[in-house]
UniProtKB/Swiss-Prot annotation:
This is PTS system glucose-specific EIIBCA component. The chain crosses the membrane at residues 126-146, 162-182, 193-213, 225-245, 260-280, 303-323, 344-364, 376-396, 409-429, 442-462. Disulfide bonds: none annotated. Its EC number is 2.7.1.199. It is found in: Cell membrane. The EIIB domain is phosphorylated by phospho-EIIA on a cysteinyl or histidyl residue, depending on the transported sugar. Then, it transfers the phosphoryl group to the sugar substrate concomitantly with the sugar uptake processed by the EIIC domain. The EIIC domain forms the PTS system translocation channel and contains the specific substrate-binding site. GO terms for biological process: phosphoenolpyruvate-dependent sugar phosphotransferase system. The active site is at C28 (phosphocysteine intermediate), H594 (tele-phosphohistidine intermediate). Its main location: membrane. InterPro entries: Dup_hybrid_motif, Glu_permease_IIB, PTrfase_EIIB_Cys, PTS_EIIA_1_perm, PTS_EIIC, PTS_EIIC_1, PTS_IIB_1, PTS_Sugar-Specific_Components. Residues 542-646 form the PTS EIIA type-1 domain. Residues 1-89 form the PTS EIIB type-1 domain. Keywords: Cell membrane, Kinase, Membrane, Phosphotransferase system, Plasmid, Sugar transport, Transferase, Transmembrane, Transmembrane helix, Transport.
Length: 674
């Protein structure tokens, strides 16, 4: 039997249109990222129907992101094992000539889109190394906090053990230009190893022996200004762009038979001097200019910047536009010795983590297993790792109301950050573990706590869903609940449903757990709760109902406008929005009637509810009336699933098709358990 990992991976690939529709595949901390040839054949709804998928986000006209959470790397590796996908191991499709094919983002602002995509895809592959290094920094800062060793002391004043520990994180940042050069070249379609070799040449002992940063030396008879390229990001980015054009020109000039030898030879021969003389200093100037501009804004009003940054992040992250800011943070550390973006960014992160913590507490109270899992994963990934994507895609982007709970937390946290003028002296991901990296760390702690608890309390007091979404969730939980305990039994005996087996009921019982009353061989026939055409559930254009995940049954294409009780029953749940009602019949059968699809978004308009929860109803009593024409005018399907939500208590359950069904037509037969 295939594992869940394999099944989900196959499900994603199949609904993306298969390997033939994919031109590129990569992943970041939480998302699988695809470029596809034809976005129209991607079945986003079907991909999202898998419980392991947190969300599906289109990008431009050819990009697709599938949000998987912290286990994304496992799914990425599993998809690579599938037929037709092995050649995507380097991210993009490769022909026999090794020339990479890239579809890219295409749209009205394709140039701007691609610029941001280029920066984002350059830094994403380096994320793991940056995360690891940031936690090593945190350990050293903690040692400083507890008075064990000064983090900022010169290396010649530190014990050998701490010098070695510093080398563990400095390896990532010192050689960052090499990593950036490789990933930037790969993104552009140039040779990634040549892209890495160009900045590497400027970090060699031989180059460093030429002199100190700021010195001018003569090379090839020309003056060369020396710079410290360790930790720089803009020089390798610009060098990679130059390499792309040089390689492209060389491949037009050099015969294919000898390109493998002479293209890399001339690329290195041209690009290393070009970078050392021109592109490198220019890149440092660009980085310093951006850093100085932001520093001027920060010096003018740290308070304003501290508020603007956390309020912007919730809108940048879904678009992937936050990644380029990492380059600016690193540049600030290289230029100024500190960074003023990471502190305020922590306000956004902890407002986000506070929000999902509130969602988790509500899910615990409601016994909502699905939301409990999603919110717990987002909470742990955030508080311990500083990763916000699981929270963003698992909760925030699925429930529109959440932004009204999130932004006040961002604002309050940003105000506190501005008051304390928070600075970071190392590049870290803002989590509980990296608090000591901020200065003053106590002020930063107050800021993230303010952001966290503001958003969490807003969720607890006002919920994270609209009234209709909350009712929808409760209806689905009631429908999916398949336990022996059920809501209170009626206060007085009620006659059994027509066609049901006789049932005994204790008069005067008020809070008795009702058990199914169908023995083996007994049968209950359920009539249609509304007039219309009875069709198989498989015809419902919703993967959850069509697959029977909420229970077996039948679907009705309404010709009338009233839902009635098919038998004597107790209303166990009814939506305020009127689009769904759940009943427990005297036989113990629990029935969910869901009027139309996506009708929750109407917020009750077009529906009139005639009953309330725990009310006793007789066969034929009206439950809900609705306006079919109004619903159709909103382009919403009216097909109404009628499903048995506690099917595991019974034997075979059969839906019966009918060209015209009404209150006298049997549409579902439920057999007693063997």
């Amino acid at each position: 039997m295939a594992s869940k990992l394999t099944t989900t991976s196959q499900h994603i690939l199949e609904n993306l249109g298969g390997p033939d529709n994919i031109t590129s595949m990569t992943h970041c901390a939480t998302r699988l990222r695809f470029q596809v040839k034809d976005q129209s054949i991607v079945d986003q709804q079907e991909i999202d129907s898998d419980p392991s998928v947190l969300g599906v986000v289109p990008q431009g006209s050819t990009g697709m992101q599938v949000v998987m959470g912290g286990s994304v790397a496992n799914y990425y590796q599993e998809i690579l094992k599938l037929d037709g996908m092995k050649h995507f191991a380097d991210g993009e499709a490769t022909e026999s000539s090794s020339k990479k094919e890239y579809g890219g983002v295409r749209g009205k602002y394709s140039g701007i889109d691609y610029a941001f995509e280029f920066l984002s895809d350059t830094f994403r592959p380096i994320l793991w190394a940056l995360l690891g290094a940031s936690l090593i920094i945190t350990l050293l800062v903690l040692a400083d906090t507890f008075g064990l060793q000064d983090f900022r002391a010169p290396m010649d004043e530190q014990p050998d053990t701490y010098v070695f520990l510093h080398s563990m994180w400095r390896s990532v940042f010192y050689f960052l230009p090499i990593m950036v050069g490789a990933t930037a070249a790969r993104k552009l379609g140039a040779n990634e190893w040549i892209g890495a070799a160009i900045p590497a040449a400027l970090l060699t002992p031989e180059f460093l022996a030429l002199g100190s940063a700021g010195d001018t030396v003569t090379v090839f008879g020309l003056p060369m200004v020396l710079n410290d390229y360790s930790g720089q990001v803009f020089p390798p980015l610009i060098a990679a762009i130059g390499l792309y054009w040089v390689e492209k020109a060389l491949k037009k000039i050099i015969p294919e038979a000898v390109q493998m030898v002479f293209v890399p030879f001339f690329s290195l021969l041209i690009m290393i001097p070009a970078t050392a003389f021109l592109l490198g200093p220019f890149g440092i100037g660009v980085g310093n200019g951006i850093s100085s501009l932001l520093e001027a804004v920060n010096n003018f009003s740290p308070f304003i910047l501290s508020i603007v940054i956390p309020l912007l992040y919730p809108f940048l992250v879904p678009l992937g536009l936050h990644w380029p800011l990492n380059a600016i943070m690193i540049q600030n550390l290289n230029t100024l010795g500190y960074d003023f973006i990471q502190g305020p960014m922590g306000a956004w992160n902890f407002a986000c983590f506070g929000l999902v913590t509130g969602v988790f507490l509500i899910a615990l109270k409601e016994k909502n297993r699905a939301m409990r899992q999603v919110s717990l994963g987002g909470m742990l990934a955030g508080l311990l790792g500083g990763i916000s994507e699981p929270s963003l895609y698992g909760v925030l982007l699925r429930f529109k109301k959440t932004y009204f709970r999130l932004l006040p937390g961002c604002l309050v946290g940003g105000i506190v950050m501005g008051i304390f003028d928070i600075k970071a002296y190392a590049f870290v991901f803002t989590s509980l573990l990296t608090i000591p990296a901020m200065d003053p760390w106590l002020g930063y702690t107050v800021g993230i706590a303010a952001a966290f608890f503001t958003s969490m309390l807003l969720v607890l007091f006002f919920d994270y869903r609209s009234d209709a979404e909350r009712d929808e969730a409760k209806a689905q939980m009631a429908a999916a609940e398949q336990t022996n305990n059920t809501p209170a039994a009626p206060a007085a005996p009620v006659a059994p449903a027509a066609g049901a087996a006789a049932a005994g009921g204790a008069a005067g019982a008020t809070a008795v757990a009702t058990k199914p009353r169908l023995a083996a061989g007994q049968l209950v026939e359920i009539t249609s709760p509304l007039e219309g055409h009875a069709v198989p559930l498989s015809e419902v254009p919703d993967p959850i109902f069509a697959a029977g995940k909420l229970g077996p049954g039948i679907a009705i294409e309404p010709t009338g406008n009233t839902v009635v009780a098919p038998a004597d029953a107790t209303v166990i749940l009814v939506q305020k929005s009127g689009h769904a009602v759940a009943l427990r019949l005297e036989s113990g059968v629990e029935l969910l009637i869901h009027i139309g699809l996506d009708t929750v978004q109407l917020g009750g308009e077009g529906f009139k509810v005639h009953v309330e929860r725990k009310q006793q109803v007789k066969a034929g009593d009206p439950l809900i009336t609705f306006d079919p024409e109004f619903i159709r005018s909103k382009n919403l399907p009216l097909i109404t699933p009628v499903v048995v939500s506690n099917a595991n208590k019974f034997g075979e359950i059969v839906g019966i098709e009918a060209a015209q069904a009404d209150a006298t037509t049997t549409v579902i037969k439920v057999n007693g358990a063997e």
